Structures are given as C-alpha cells and as structure tokens.
Amino acid sequence: KGSQAQISSPSQALAARIAYASENRRDEGIIRDLSVRENLILAVQAKRGWARPLPAQEKNALVEKYMTALNVRPADPDRPISNLSGGNQQKVLLGRWLATQPEVLILDEPTRGIDIGAKTEIMEEVIALADEGVAIVFISSELDEVVRLSDRVVVLKDRRKLADLTADASLTSDSIISTIAEEPA
C-alpha cells in the first residue's frame, strides 16, 4: 500500500500479503511427494497456522476454485503433483499463492519451460489479477512477454537499476536490449 516493509521470512511476507513464486518450481516450489490438493493449500495452511487445520470443506472449496480457474489438468486433486506436466505444476503453484489473496504477487520466470497453452493460461490469469488491483512484479528474461504485460519496466543488471521505463509505444524488446547494451562496463 505504498509503504516499505522489512520482510525477513516467508511467514512475514504472507502476513504482509506478499506472495513469491520462484522460477525453480521443482526445488523451491512443489513438494513432489504431496498431492495437487496438498500443494495447493500449503500456503493458506501456513498462513493460518499448523495448529489450526483448515476444515475439509474449506480445503475442497479452495482446491476446486483454483484448479478450475487455472484449468489444471488432469482435474484430480488427489493425484501426486509429480505426475503433472510442468505447466500444470506451475498453475498449481500460482493457485497456491492466489489462495492467500496477495496484494503483491512476485512471479519469477513464471512461464519458463512450459508449453504455449499453459503459458497463455497463466498470462491471462496474471492480466486478470493486475486488472483486479493486485500488484504484479514480473521477473522474466522473455522480453516480448515483459513488453506485452507491463505498465512499467525496471531494467536491472548486476543488482543495479539501469532504467525505469514506462510502457508506451517506444517500449520494445529492442529498446530494453539497447538499455542493457549501452550500460558502461
């Protein structure tokens, strides 16, 4: 809400309504031994506290809502998540964070390594979230995606801000590459 926050743990981020989906879904996202259902509700349960389990009816409603909204296939919440395609695993992870009702959603390479159909569905959901007022921080090396989806582009190199660009007719993949290339070594 326009104020700075000192976040030092995932639980503090959840409490501040900030969600982060890592680019490394296999090592930092999914828990391979759990079902789709268990992976999807994980963040909501963590936010609520492990001593207060979510009622089964609430779990089922959340799982149904996000599996349907994100078109997770196959639509079997009890299937091990490791049996899903990479794109569907990514959709479950996005659903996990959406279920926490974030005000800020940080997506790190959300479409890397997934098929074009899943990529399109995820991007449509991201656009809908932005339209609903969720602040999206979209980290991507796919510059065409960045240009198409962004109101504002901050170009970083070696942890330094090179430029803060507004999305207008002059913002293109080439203009971003030029910004990076023109930076003195």
Placement of each model-derived feature along the sequence:
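Glycine-rich phosphate-binding loops of nucleotide-dependent enzymes
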Residues: 1-185
